[in-house]
Amino acid sequence: LDWMPTLLAAAGVPDIKEKLLTGYTIGNRTYKVHLDGFNMLPLLTGETTKDPRESFLYFNDDAQLTAMRYDNWKCVFMEQRVQGTMKIWSEPFVTLRIPKIFNLRTDPFERADVTSNTYYDWLLDHAFIFVPSQVYVGQFISTFKDFPPRQKAASFNLDEVMQKMQEGGGSN
C-alpha cells in the first residue's frame, strides 16, 4: 500500500498520491484514483521520526471492513471465530454488535477479551476510543463519494456467482 508512493518518491515523484487525485497522465492514459498509500521515504531515510499513516484499516477477502487501528488502539468490528486450518475459508465472519477494543501495547495478541474476567468493564471505561475510530473510518468512507469502489470482491458463494452470470457479468 505504501510502497508505490515511497518508491516513486525515491525515483523523483514525491507527490504521486496528490497527482492521482486530480488525474495524472502517463503516456496516452489518464489515471484518476484515490491511492490509500503514504510516502514513507522521509521516515525510512531518518529525515523524520513521524509515521505519516495515522490509522490502518483491515479488510477481509470479501472487502468488508473488519477492524481499524490507530496509535496503540485497535477496534474490531468483525471476527473470524474459527481457529486456524482451512476451515476459516468456509466459515463467515461474525459482525459484532459492539466493537471490541484492544490496546496493542499491553495486549499485542488481542486476547484480553478471552483471558480477562473484567474485559467488558475495561471496554466500557475505554469507550472514548470509539470517537477517533469513527472519525478515521468516516474519512475513509468519504473518499467513496469521488472514488467509488470499482469492483466487487470475488466470491465463492455459488448464489452470487449464478446471479452474476444471469446478469451477464461473467465470472470474477
Segments (PLM) and residue ranges:
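Long, internal low-complexity/basic segments
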Residues: Y70, C75, R81-V82, S90-K100, ...
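C-terminal cap/loop subdomain of S1 sulfatases and analogous C-terminal strand-loop tails that border
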Residues: L1-R105, F109-R111
